[in-house]
């Protein structure tokens, strides 16, 4: 039951209510409060290096989250791949998931290494 493998280098910020399932996590992973990383039909996400999951966001099922990407507040990724260096965010008016290229890795601010070369 307690066999989730976490990366060597990660940061949990205000971790209350956060559930981290048996996904594959890359290093320099950042996760905030109220987040869920979980399975759908026994398939878990694969999360790259330097990924950030902000407050109340979720990644569920067979998803590949590319290096340096951010899952924005209250955004759910369900069995969807996110390219490296992109921000996934939900348009609260339409409920549509939007993907935007990111010039700066959000996780970079928390670690004293250049995540662009990891």
Positions of PLM-derived features:
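A generic structural motif
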Residues: 15, 24-26, 42
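Extended, small-residue-rich solenoid/repeat segments and analogous flexible loops
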Residues: 1-21
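Short "repeat-start/strand-capping" segments in structured domains, especially the N-termini
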Residues: 23-27, 83-84
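Active-site-proximal segments of catalytic enzyme domains
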Residues: 28, 34, 50
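Glycine-rich hexapeptide-repeat left-handed beta-helix
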Residues: 39-42, 47-118
């Amino acid at each position: 039951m307690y066999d989730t493998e976490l990366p060597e280098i990660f940061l949990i910020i205000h971790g209350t209510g956060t559930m981290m399932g048996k996904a594959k996590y890359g290093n320099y992973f950042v996760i905030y409060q109220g987040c869920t990383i979980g399975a759908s039909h026994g398939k878990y996400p694969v999360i790259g290096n330097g990924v950030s999951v902000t407050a109340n966001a979720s990644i569920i099922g067979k998803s590949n989250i590319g290096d340096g990407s951010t899952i924005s507040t209250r955004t759910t990724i369900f069995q969807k791949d996110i390219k490296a260096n992109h921000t996934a965010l939900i348009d609260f008016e339409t409920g549509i998931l939007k993907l935007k290229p990111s010039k700066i890795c959000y996780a970079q601010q928390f670690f004293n290494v250049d995540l662009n070369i990891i």
